[in-house]
Structure formats: C-alpha cells, structure tokens
C-alpha cells in the first residue's frame, strides 16, 4: 500500500495512506511515520513479506522509507532504470530503484533492472561502456580510497552523533573516507517545486491518455473525480497540489 498519489496531491498528505488500502504502519511502531510514497514497499521488505520491492522516487520516496524502516534502498541516477509504465510526477527526477534487506541483493537487483528501453528516452544517455555489474565491487576492499559524502542528520541528539561517528569509523576501517555535508536548504525549493508542478501536469495527462478504458484522461478529470468522491478519497487531506499543477501549466 503506497501513499495516495505519491504524496503529490496535497501539501497535507499523510505518508503511507491511500483511499484504497488505508494506512501503512512503520515496522518499528504504530505511531511512527512510514515515510515516502514507497512506504508499503519498504514495510513489506522489512516485515519479510517479500525479499525485494521496486520503489519509485522523485524526491525521497525510496531513501526515506528505506531509512526509517531499516532496509536498503537505492535511488539510481535518472535514466539508468526505465520508468515506462510508472505513474509520473517529474520526467527529470523520477526513477525506480531496488528496496531490499542487504546491499548485496540491492546491487544484484539494480543490475537486473537497469538498461536501455526504447520507451524511455532517459535511458538513451546510458554510456555504451556501462557493464551493469554493480555487485562486482562488493568486496572487503571495495571502499579503499573512496570518498563518501554523508548528509548530516540527527547530530543534535546524543544517539544520532554516536551513529554518525560509527559510520565514519566503520568506513575508515575499510579504507574509505566520509565527508560530512551540511545542507540546510529546503526541499523542494521554489524553482524545483514549480518544475514539479509543470512536469506533473504534462506527464499525467500523457500517461492517462495512453491507457485504454479509463474514465479519466487529464489532471482536470482527476480533480473532478476527487471532488465527486471526496468523502472517500479526501477524508484526511485535500488536493491543493493538483490545483496548483493545473494552474502552473
């Protein structure tokens, strides 16, 4: 069960809730946020329902639920994995990626799902020299002389600082170096948010029109559907992002 419209219908969206499936719960507690639009995918992996899930991410929808549910999630570079058939938000940011319990399995899955797809132009940019053997570097010396950037988060708490230090020391012991990155910017920023609004309108219209036997063929149709069925689909939050996207175009 995934978040309604990938958390892109309302600024008041509830992660893990959909009008079809109800509320997805965080694996560690009923009162904790399952996070991200791929919340159900992360919980299914963590709780052992599946070995592998394929999440989708525009901005945090793989990394966040993977983080808070204690699994491994990878958001690949856009264009490495085909997005064909996936409900779009942003053609410049959307991608699919593996969600598993181990780095090794995540690397194997990424190798399997990566590659050229004539139905997704973003994959045209994959270098011809790409081997897709992402598991080949999973050795004890795989991090030797590698520099890894780590966004600093939670350092204001004692346990958070201890975990950051543990990450740094563990990677150093394996021959790598951690560079802590301070980033206080808000996401999405105004420019990025407008781009998301614009690309969503264009992308969702094209996606809906490519499907047969649907009663909706545009963002405007979706807005009208939600308004007509608000008691079911808008129980907890509205559709202000949909309105903004319609106006942005």
Where are the regions a protein language model picked out?
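Acyltransferase
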Residues: 133-135, 159-183, 203-226
């Amino acid at each position: 069960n995934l978040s309604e419209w990938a958390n892109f219908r309302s600024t008041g969206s509830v992660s893990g809730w959909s009008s079809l499936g109800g509320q997805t719960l965080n694996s560690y507690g009923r009162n904790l946020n399952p996070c991200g639009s791929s919340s159900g995918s992360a919980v299914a992996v963590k709780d052992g329902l599946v070995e592998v899930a394929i999440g989708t991410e525009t901005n945090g929808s793989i990394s966040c639920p993977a983080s808070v549910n204690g699994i491994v999630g990878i958001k690949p570079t856009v264009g490495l994995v085909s997005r064909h058939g996936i409900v779009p938000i942003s053609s410049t940011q959307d991608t699919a990626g593996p969600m598993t319990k181990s780095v090794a399995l995540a690397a194997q899955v990424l190798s399997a799902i990566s590659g050229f797809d004539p139905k997704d132009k973003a994959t045209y940019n994959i270098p011809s020299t790409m081997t897709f053997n992402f598991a080949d570097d999973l050795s004890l010396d795989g991090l030797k002389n590698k520099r890894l950037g780590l966004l600093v988060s939670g350092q204001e708490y004692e346990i958070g600082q201890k975990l950051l230090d543990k990450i740094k020391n563990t990677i150093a012991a394996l021959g790598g170096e951690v560079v802590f990155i301070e980033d206080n910017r808000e996401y999405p920023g105004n420019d990025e948010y407008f781009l998301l609004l614009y690309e969503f309108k264009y992308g969702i219209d094209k996606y809906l029109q490519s499907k047969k036997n649907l009663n909706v063929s545009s963002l405007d149709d979706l807005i009208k559907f939600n308004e007509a069925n608000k008691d079911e689909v808008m129980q907890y939050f509205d559709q202000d992002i949909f309105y903004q996207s319609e106006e942005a175009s």
